[in-house]
């Protein structure tokens, strides 16, 4: 890179920011990562409590393909199993999605939908689900779950959300068979950017998911600069010309941001192009981890609870990763949809734990006798909400980006998309070459004017 080309500014020291700098370095582009907090990793944090239980904040699962691409393939454990079921009541737990095809009322409803072809607005999530799966399955399972983690009625949500759900049933059948044959948690629809295959399976890195962030950070040309909040992104004629980090102006023609897209407009000085993203909403989560005696308390790793429970999903992670809990003990994670300040969010820890324990009886009859500890985490940025009100702007962000030359919004929160760590990696691997080329293009290189004079204040 030319000495006159200023480094790329990467805002955020979580996995998306670290991977951005990692990929830029692969293309010989200098980048400085600035993290507002005192440590790297963002949501992807791991720790072990005094009772010997290991916790991950953020994604639990990654694949062997992803870790191999990062050079971490030799430092991971293979997950022996992974599966999802849906609680339908009466002791019925059909597997998702295959087992639902064996429920007679769902099959009949879907067939009737195909035969009668009722008029439906396929831009609306409620109508799209009913069209694709039949009204009974949609109304009893899919839509209640969608509404629980989105926080909006399904007739106010965009059908784009359905594109995030795997629908290739034949492929799913084959991959399920591969799971049984290989006794590995073969990936099924977990990553949207790269295809599922029998040789791609879930693994867990030594040191937890936070170890991935540390591995990437340790191999960057420059140390991540901590406690350095981004305060401004300077724009002239809809082109990035600089940034202010922790009170210091920095000249650059390229900023890669991992901030939530609805907060990014607050930093922009010199353009209102991003104001349309201010009304985007994220749904929060209240995560309740229960420590229990025993194991194999749930019928499968994940149990979806579409009706009759205050949470939409219950997970017994030690069924997939036995090593995260002491022998003879397990953890049950209950996920409740919430918004900052609402009735669920403001419950005390004791109250929200009691709400979970008091309703888990249909799944774990002797739950009270088994519980001996709990922890609660409130995550304000759980899921992006694909509301119809701003679907046009959301689609434009996905196809056209921010609209400001040299400003790239990446990662789950930055792209406002239902993607996980591995999706972010493969997207960046495809995007970064063009970003690097533009950044080093002579027509985009700035002069050597000091940043204090070049950047407006």
Give a label for each model feature.
Residues 6-33:
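N-terminal Rossmann-like FAD-binding beta1-loop-alpha1 element of flavoenzymes
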Residues 16, 39, 262:
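Conserved Rossmann-like nucleotide-cofactor binding loop
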Residues 25-48:
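Glycine-rich FAD pyrophosphate-binding loop
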Residues 27, 229-333, 337-346, 350, ...:
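Mid-domain catalytic core of redox enzymes
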Residues 46, 97-101, 317, 321-457:
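Conserved flavin/dinucleotide-binding core of flavoenzymes
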Residues 50-120, 124, 167:
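Dinucleotide-binding Rossmann-like beta1-alpha1 core, especially the glycine-rich loop
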Residues 66-95, 133-139, 219-226, 231-241:
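Feature captures the FAD/FMN-dependent oxidoreductase FAD-binding
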Residues 115-232:
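Active-site/ligand-binding neighborhood in enzyme catalytic cores
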